[in-house]
C-alpha cells in the first residue's frame, strides 16, 4: 500500500481531482494516465454521488455526466483496475459516507487495498462519526484523510490531527468547492496550528486553480489540491488529455518555484 506521506518528500505535491466516469469510463482512465505522465503526484477519484454536499456546480455537473454513463461504486472499482494496468500513480477516493456504508465498510476497504487505493476523503463524515469506520480502514492500511476548515479551533485541530492518517486536507475557504479569484483566509496561521499538532503533511484545497495561487500556497503548505479547475478542463475539452498535461506541467513548475503564470 502506498504511504501517502512519501508524495510530499521531495517536492511540493500537486494533487488533482477527477470524477470517475466523466465524461465516460475510458476517458477517465486516459485522464489519470495523462495527469500521472505530466507530473501529478496523487489523483483523487471522486465517486459520483446524488447529494455531494461539499461540491460546487462544476463537480455536481460532472457527477450527473457520470450517472448518465451508469457509473456505480462497483464500476468505479473496475475503472481503477483499468487505471492500474497503465499507471502506478498514488490514488485516493473522494466519496460520501452513505456510499461506503451501503457497500459495507470491510468490503469497501478490501477493494481499496486490493487496488492500492491508499486513502479515503469523506467530506460528510466528521471526526465524531468516524469511530466505526476508522478501525476497519486501519486494519486494511487505508488512510482516512481529514478535512480541517478555517473555523476549526485549536482543540478541534488537535483532536482531528490525533486521528489523521496520510495527510491533512486544509479547506482554504468556507463553502463548497469551486475556483476562487482571491483566497483571503489566514492560511499561514491555520497551517501553523496544524503543524503544532501533527507531523503529517498538509495540503490545501478548495478554490486553487492558477499557477500563481499554487506557488503562493507552496510557501505555506506541503502541496495543493485542484478539483474544480481540472473538472472544468475535462468538461470543456474532449479529449482532455493534452490540456490536462499542459495544465499539470504549469502547476508543477509553479510549485517548484519556476514560474507563476496564469491559466486562461
UniProtKB/Swiss-Prot annotation:
Enzyme category, top tier: lyase
Annotated active site: 44, 55
Pathway annotation: Amino-acid biosynthesis; L-tryptophan biosynthesis; L-tryptophan from chorismate: step 5/5
GO CC field: cytosol
Function: The alpha subunit is responsible for the aldol cleavage of indoleglycerol phosphate to indole and glyceraldehyde 3-phosphate.
Subunit and partners: Tetramer of two alpha and two beta chains.
Descriptive protein name: Tryptophan synthase alpha chain
Organism in which the protein naturally occurs: Lactiplantibacillus plantarum (strain ATCC BAA-793 / NCIMB 8826 / WCFS1)
Amino acid at each position: 500500500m502506498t504511504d501517502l506521506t512519501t508524495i510530499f518528500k521531495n517536492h511540493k505535491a500537486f494533487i488533482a481531482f477527477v470524477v470517475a466516469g466523466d465524461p465516460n469510463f475510458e476517458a477517465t482512465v486516459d485522464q489519470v494516465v495523462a495527469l500521472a505522465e505530466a507530473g501529478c503526484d496523487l489523483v483523487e477519484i471522486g465517486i459520483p454521488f446524488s447529494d455531494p454536499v461539499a461540491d460546487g456546480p462544476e463537480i455536481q455537473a460532472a457527477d450527473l455526466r457520470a450517472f448518465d454513463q451508469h457509473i456505480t461504486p462497483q464500476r468505479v472499482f473496475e475503472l481503477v483496475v483499468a487505471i492500474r494496468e497503465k499507471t502506478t500513480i498514488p490514488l485516493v477516493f473522494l466519496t460520501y459516507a452513505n456510499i461506503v456504508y451501503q457497500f459495507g465498510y470491510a468490503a469497501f476497504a478490501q477493494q481499496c487495498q486490493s487496488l492500492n487505493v491508499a486513502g479515503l476523503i469523506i467530506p460528510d463524515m466528521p471526526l465524531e462519526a468516524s469511530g466505526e469506520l476508522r478501525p476497519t480502514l486501519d486494519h486494511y492500511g487505508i488512510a482516512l484523510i481529514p478535512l480541517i476548515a478555517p473555523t476549526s479551533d485549536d482543540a478541534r485541530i488537535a483532536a482531528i490531527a490525533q486521528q489523521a492518517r496520510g495527510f491533512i486536507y486544509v479547506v482554504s475557504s468556507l463553502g463548497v468547492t469551486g475556483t476562487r479569484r482571491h483566497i483571503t483566509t489566514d492560511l499561514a496561521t491555520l497551517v501553523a496550528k496544524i503543524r503544532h499538532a501533527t507531523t503529517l503533511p498538509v495540503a490545501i484545497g478548495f478554490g486553487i486553480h492558477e499557477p500563481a495561487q499554487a506557488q503562493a500556497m507552496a510557501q505555506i503548505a506541503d502541496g495543493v489540491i485542484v478539483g474544480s479547475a481540472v473538472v472544468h478542463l475535462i468538461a470543456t475539452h474532449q479529449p482532455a488529455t493534452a490540456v490536462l498535461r499542459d495544465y499539470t506541467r504549469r502547476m508543477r513548475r509553479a510549485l517548484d518555484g519556476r514560474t507563476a503564470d496564469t491559466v486562461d
